[in-house]
Amino acid sequence: MTCKIDYQPAADLLHGRIILVTGAGDGIGRAAALAFAGHGATVILLGRTIAKLEKVYDEIEAAGGPQPAIFPLNVEGATLKDYHDMAETLDKEFGRLDGLLHNAGMLGRITPFEQYNPELWEQVMQVNINGPIWMTQALLPLLKASPDASVVFTSSSVGRRGRAYWGAYAVSKFATEGFVQVLADEVEHLGTLRVNSLNPGATRTAMRKAAYPGEDPLALRTPEEIMPTYLWLMGPDSQGHNGEPFDAQPPKQG
């Protein structure tokens, strides 16, 4: 796996780019939205909680970034029509999309498969894989309209090597890795669109705390500290990389 945690982006790396971030209200999504805007991008903040999105919007404006846009959407309940309506709105507003970060995710439960609830399984699959792929399908014309577009799907170490009790979350991330390879191969001939996966690694987030309640959060990197790889993937320096798995930080030891 390739990791770009030491990448030093130019201040105007993403100048003029339009980038959509899902799950932009907190955690890694918030950090990515702020980082992208801080390097010149117009960021579309997508999430289900408007108050959180508004707070990130205000933070971007206060920092002097380009005016962002807010798009409230709950991926868990969204339909194909919702995604196509969204694409139509974005087309009218922006005419293209230069970046798409699929960050929104759902952990489900860490439990033996024998005890896994089928309804919860379906929910996790909807948020982590079905929603992102149909959203991507709806947004493909906008991504193809860009001279240089990057799509990043969030993966996980348990989506590259399965581990006991990780259930639907692990399976959804294996599916994510597979879909990235399929779509990347389909768009390879375009030369203007790349699709890659990114494993954030052990990061100080609410999801990490839910998965590892006994872990000391201060021993983990913050979302802000893992942004270099996100910036590298969204910017022009990652051109030529397509269908590849990346890590946002070196693997945690021990």
Regions found by a protein language model. Give the residues of each.
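Conserved glycine-rich cofactor-binding loop
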Residues: 18, 23-27
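Conserved glycine-rich Rossmann-like NAD(P)H-binding loop of the short-chain dehydrogenase/reductase
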Residues: 41-55
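Substrate-binding pocket helix/loop in short-chain dehydrogenase/reductase
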Residues: 86, 111-113, 117-122
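Active-site helix of classical SDR
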Residues: 136, 172
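Residue(s) in the substrate-gating loop at a strand-loop-helix junction
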Residues: 156
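Active-site-adjacent segment of SDR/Rossmann-fold oxidoreductases
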Residues: 161, 182-193
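C-terminal helical subdomain
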Residues: 193, 197-198, 205, 213-254
